[in-house]
């Protein structure tokens, strides 16, 4: 099981990400895409990253907006896995 991060570690790692915010025990970001099909294509790419990492975000799709939420359920909060996947997601955007 991944080790849960402290509040200080979470804030430090959030400083390395753009647009991700902490919402309790998760980090969240909303992506604005040019069209609904491009939003779906983005989600498919995120799905492949998530599957490869063995770590899956909660996904909310609203027309051209995709909101991703990351947390490590078995650790009961945020772990390095969440920040690693957030970084990978940002790299494909």
From Swiss-Prot:
Give the Gene Ontology MF terms in alphabetical order: 4-alpha-hydroxytetrahydrobiopterin dehydratase activity
Q: Which Gene3D superfamilies match?
A: Transcriptional coactivator/pterin dehydratase (3.30.1360.20)
Reaction equations catalysed: (4aS,6R)-4a-hydroxy-L-erythro-5,6,7,8-tetrahydrobiopterin = (6R)-L-erythro-6,7-dihydrobiopterin + H2O
Q: What is its EC number?
A: 4.2.1.96
Gene Ontology BP, a term: tetrahydrobiopterin biosynthetic process
The organism sits in which domain of life? Bacteria
The record ties this protein, via PANTHER family, to: PTERIN-4-ALPHA-CARBINOLAMINE DEHYDRATASE
Recorded protein name is Putative pterin-4-alpha-carbinolamine dehydratase
Q: Which organism is it from?
A: Roseiflexus sp. (strain RS-1)
């Amino acid at each position: 099981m991944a080790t849960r991060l402290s509040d200080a570690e979470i804030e430090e790692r959030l400083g390395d990400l753009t647009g991700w915010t902490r919402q309790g025990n998760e980090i969240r970001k909303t992506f604005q895409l040019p069209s609904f099909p491009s939003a779906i294509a983005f989600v498919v790419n995120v799905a492949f990253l998530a599957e490869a990492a063995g770590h899956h975000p909660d996904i909310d799709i609203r027309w051209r907006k995709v909101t991703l939420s990351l947390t490590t359920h078995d650790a009961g909060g945020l772990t390095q896995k969440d920040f690693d996947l957030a970084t990978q997601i940002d790299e494909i955007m």
